[in-house]
Regions:
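Short amphipathic alpha-helical interface patches used for protein-protein assembly/oligomerization
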Residues: 89-93
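Hydrophobic alpha-helical membrane-insertion signals
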Residues: 1-28
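Anion-binding and metal-coordination hotspots
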Residues: 3, 72-85, 95-496
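Short secondary-structure boundary/capping segments within folded domains
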Residues: 18-21, 53, 221
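Basic, short loop/linker segments at the boundary and entry of helix-turn-helix/winged-helix-like folds
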Residues: 23-66, 71-72
């Protein structure tokens, strides 16, 4: 039967906002999982105690921005429009129906001029600390990767610029080891002349709209100005750290500041899982020397097309020579400034070699083989990737760090940014990742009853008996709660 409802939009009603928000709403879960009054401790030094106009509650300002990032709203203007009309949003920030929400410019001004990078970092760490206290973090293995964020800059508005080449962070250590290696081989060490020569420059393309962004062009991606978010997460997809750089900075270059942050906050981690972009001599050396393991993937050798395969050249550690496919020795020649030992063949042997065309096209009939002084650490990573434990860890990358990037872009609006400048984009990314961690924390807090200790104690037991979990990965906790059993099974543990 057709029913035509009469519209009565002017009717007066008494409404209890508490009853209008469902008990299983996401914002209720987040509000129950964490105490937002902690934010007052982070911002109290930024306000005057006895002077000035009354401010908007800083907790309200942070809750508004968290709403924007949790629901992937594109701008603060749109966010405040939604907050004004959405009952759940009003309940979350504590504003009744008849109270006007803050103007979007007030929120924008505070996050641009009052709440600095330190404040945002405190909030990011506070959310992670809350998750750690509940036992949700599993930092035994850390997954590292980078993803690009399209900048608010037109590719056509660009200009060429000569910028000085930045020295590598490990340049001093490499220089010392190169000289030590040269002295061991009877060569004269290099002189330190970096202070005498002006720094080398390189030509690059800079956006006239956002000069701090960088050109990004990789694979099938369209060329654009972008930023790069170098990120680390744990086994439960909690984001542990992020370092934002221009889009033209390689992953291996940005690894050091991110790894410093991880070592400072999570020194207990044992394994770093990363793709081939991080499989460099310096990164391998740093991770293995710190007593940890780098779990990475196979790297296709960059050899000559239709030439000898890479494994046909064998390094003889005893004689410090390289044996070529025709069983001739390439003897040590020198160690260059980049840290590579050069092994060269004898020209008279190469002239009569039947496979010279597959080996070298040098006019001098001389084959040069390069081997880094830290190559042994790369070989350690290559050996470790064949172990079953680390092979399985690497297979989890697509479910961990790649899933974090997919959720951030598809559900939380991180595909492109409307902010300009490295500092603003960094704060924007950290707040977005804090919101994602908060969302996960809220879901876990509400889905697991306080009496169910399976999930919360899993990490504590794994930390104490980690060696047994490495040998028997099927060993887990006996928890009969339905939700907990599902979550523990998702994490890779058995409940029987």
């Amino acid at each position: 039967m057709l029913v035509k409802k009469a519209e009565d939009r002017g009717q007066l009603e008494f409404v209890n906002l508490e009853n209008m928000v469902p008990q299983d709403h996401l914002l209720r879960k987040i509000d129950a999982a964490i105490d937002f009054k902690k934010i007052y401790e982070f911002v109290e030094d930024l306000y005057c105690e006895d002077n000035g106009r009354p401010s908007v509650d800083p907790v309200v300002l942070f809750k508004i921005v968290l709403i924007q990032h949790i629901y992937g709203l594109p701008s603060l203007r749109r966010t405040l429009e939604e907050v004004s009309m959405n009952l759940a949003y009003r309940w979350f920030i504590g504003y009744p129906l008849n109270e006007a929400v803050p103007h979007f410019s007030t929120v924008s001004y505070n996050f641009k001029h009052r709440f600095n990078h330190t404040t945002v970092e405190h909030v990011f760490r506070w959310v992670l600390k809350s998750a750690a206290e509940e036992g949700y973090l599993d930092t035994e293995a850390i997954f590292v990767d980078g993803t690009h964020i399209k900048a608010s800059a037109n590719l056509k508005k660009q200009a060429g610029k000569a910028v000085p080449k930045q020295a590598k962070r490990y340049a001093k250590e490499l220089f010392e080891e190169v000289n030590k290696d040269r002295e061991e081989h009877g060569k004269k060490p290099f002189s330190e002349d970096s202070g005498k020569k002006p720094p080398e420059e390189r030509e690059t393309v800079v956006s006239t709209t956002d000069p701090e962004s960088g050109i990004f062009h990789k694979g099938e991606h369209k060329k654009c100005f972008a930023y790069e978010a170098h990120t680390a997460c744990d086994k439960h997809n909690f984001i542990l750290g992020v370092h934002v750089t221009p889009g033209n900075v390689p992953d291996s270059t940005a690894f050091d500041p991110l790894y410093d942050e991880l070592c400072q906050n999570y020194p207990e981690h044992k394994t770093v899982v990363a793709d081939s972009a991080y499989k460099t001599p310096w990164i391998c050396k740093r991770i293995f020397e710190s007593g940890r393991v780098l779990s990475t993937c196979y790297t296709r050798p960059k050899t000559k097309e239709k030439g000898h395969p890479w494994w046909a050249y064998v390094y003889d550690e005893y004689f410090d020579d390289v044996i070529c496919p025709e069983y001739h020795a390439l003897h040590y020649s020198t160690t260059n400034r980049d840290g590579y030992r050069e092994y060269k063949s004898r020209a008279y042997l190469c002239k009569t070699c039947p496979t010279r065309g597959m080996c070298t096209e040098s006019a001098k009939c001389e084959k040069t083989f390069l081997r880094h002084i830290w190559q042994e650490y790369v070989e350690m990573a290559e050996d470790i990737r064949h172990m079953a434990v680390y092979r399985e860890l690497y297979r989890l990358r697509k479910e961990k760090i790649e899933r974090v990037f997919a959720d951030a872009k598809e559900k939380h609006g991180m595909r492109y940014t409307q902010y300009r400048g490295l500092a603003q984009v960094t704060n924007w990314v950290k707040l977005k990742f804090a919101a994602m961690n908060l969302k996960k924390n809220g879901h876990l807090e509400m889905e697991l009853p306080p009496s169910c200790t399976g999930w919360r104690q899993t990490n504590k037991i794994r930390e104490k008996y980690s060696c047994y979990f490495d040998i028997f990965p099927f060993f887990g906790l006996a928890c009969t709660h339905k939700t907990c059993s599902g979550l523990i099974a998702t994490a890779g543990f058995s409940t029987s």
